[in-house]
Regions:
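Contiguous, well-folded functional domains in the mature portion of proteins
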Residues: 1-198, 203-204, 217-221
Length: 221
């Protein structure tokens, strides 16, 4: 029994080397597992409209998490919560979770969330806000579970579908599109009415004429 337990733990904590695409626009799977959700959703951690890909891990999958994109960590948010079955929709909002938001070199924001599950009771995160991470770099671990949600920009093209199996860093789950630039605010051009030379000179000429026509007694007064 001891050896069986030892083999199970050794397999669970394994972290095999993987081949990864060199496509800079590729978003790689952060974990081994099965896609259970592909939909548009408002990311609760950035407030942006996004495309969501959820990947569920069973106890036999590799549970090391890898960064799906390269960039700088903008924020990390940890939430205490319940330990519901991670395949349930409400697990995204109610379970213990850790959300990391990364901004890519071209300014695109990608958020990925470690979610604990029914068996998993421990989320580990090895990175800090401000760290610059490479794509496919190990950043965390969920012991004995569970699920990772990836929130992508709306311009991204999702390449996986519900029910599809993923292999961490080997499976490309999406490709980032071109970054959407905010509209440039143009200052309104203000046209100043200058008028003709004659119109500009008229007030000055009128003032001179008034001074000449003034009577001596008026000046004396």
């Amino acid at each position: 029994i001891f050896w069986l337990l030892f083999l199970f733990v050794a397999q669970f904590f394994r972290d095999p080397a993987r081949e990864m695409t060199d496509d800079e626009k590729a978003v790689v799977a952060p974990v081994d597992g099965r896609v259970i959700k592909v939909e548009e959703a408002v990311c609760p951690y950035t407030g942006e409209q996004t495309k969501l890909v959820s990947i569920f891990m069973n106890v036999f999958n590799v549970h090391s998490q890898k960064t799906p994109v390269a960039g700088k960590i903008e924020k990390i948010e940890y939430f205490h919560g319940r330990y519901l079955n991670a395949s349930l929709d409400k697990a995204s909002e109610q379970n213990e979770r850790n959300a990391m938001t990364v901004v890519t070199e071209d300014g695109q924001r990608v958020c990925f969330v470690q979610i604990a599950g029914l068996v998993a009771r421990r989320i580990l995160c090895y990175r800090m806000v401000g760290d610059v991470v490479k794509k496919g770099e190990r950043y965390g671990f969920i012991r004995f579970g569970s699920r990772v949600d990836v929130y992508l920009p709306m311009s991204a093209q999702v390449l996986v579908s519900i029910g599809e199996k993923t292999t961490g860093v080997e499976t490309v789950i999406a490709r980032l599109g071109e970054p959407v630039q905010p509209p440039v605010a143009h200052e309104e051009e203000t046209t100043e009415t200058v008028g003709t030379a004659e119109e500009q000179a008229a007030p000055e000429a009128a003032a001179q004429s008034s001074a000449v026509d003034a009577k001596p007694e008026d000046k004396a007064q």
